[in-house]
């Protein structure tokens, strides 16, 4: 976490991949570009090493190993969806390095993707990084440009600044960010693929 010059607390979401961060609106899938699941950013990866963007618990892993849901102690829920329509690969090209329930540190390896094999299959490897919950009462900034996995922030979630700027108020805001957990993060990865399929069918029809 970083403290901004105006006294607000910023929760830094690091890039899970080395590459280039681009606006979510540029992702050629309406489920992501229209922010149906959540807001965030997308990464054009240079390699397939997928790391955790935040200290968190692994709350969901897609059966096909292409998507990961995480929840931080502060209630921030993050979903990483490696590539588009990668659910159709049924786990091919992906190697999972964690299991549900694991506690991971920012920068810790979650999975490995065979980027060359994905490109040979003509899979679009653009990877949405979404904030799916825990942002109630908070604002969010996304950043674009070259990024290094586990080092450069791509999203900052800001708590509302305490009126008197006191450290006590800041601490209270962090310890009780929402009062209650957001949507069930354990279903995040499945929800993303169901909504993608539903949207795709509606576009066809």
Language-model features, listed with the residues they occupy:
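Contiguous, well-folded functional domains in the mature portion of proteins
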Residues: 1-178, 182-184, 190, 194-204
């Amino acid at each position: 976490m970083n403290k901004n010059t105006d006294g607000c607390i910023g929760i830094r979401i690091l890039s899970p991949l080395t590459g280039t961060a681009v606006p979510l609106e540029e992702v050629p899938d309406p489920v992501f570009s229209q922010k149906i699941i959540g807001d965030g950013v997308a990464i054009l990866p240079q390699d397939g090493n997928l790391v955790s963007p935040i200290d968190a618990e692994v709350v969901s892993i897609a059966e096909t190993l292409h998507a990961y849901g995480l929840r931080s102690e502060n209630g921030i829920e993050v979903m990483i969806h490696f590539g588009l329509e990668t659910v159709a690969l049924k786990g091919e090209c992906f190697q999972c390095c964690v299991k549900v329930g694991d506690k991971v540190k920012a920068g810790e390896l979650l999975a490995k993707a065979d980027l060359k094999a994905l490109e040979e299959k003509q899979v679009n490897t653009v990877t949405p990084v979404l904030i799916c919950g825990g942002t109630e009462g908070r604002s969010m900034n996304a950043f674009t440009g070259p990024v290094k996995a586990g080092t450069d922030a791509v999203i900052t979630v800001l708590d509302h600044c305490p009126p008197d700027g006191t450290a006590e108020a800041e601490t209270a805001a962090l310890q009780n960010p929402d009062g209650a957990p957001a949507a069930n993060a354990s279903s995040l990865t499945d929800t993303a693929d169901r909504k993608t399929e539903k949207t795709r069918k509606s576009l066809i029809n």
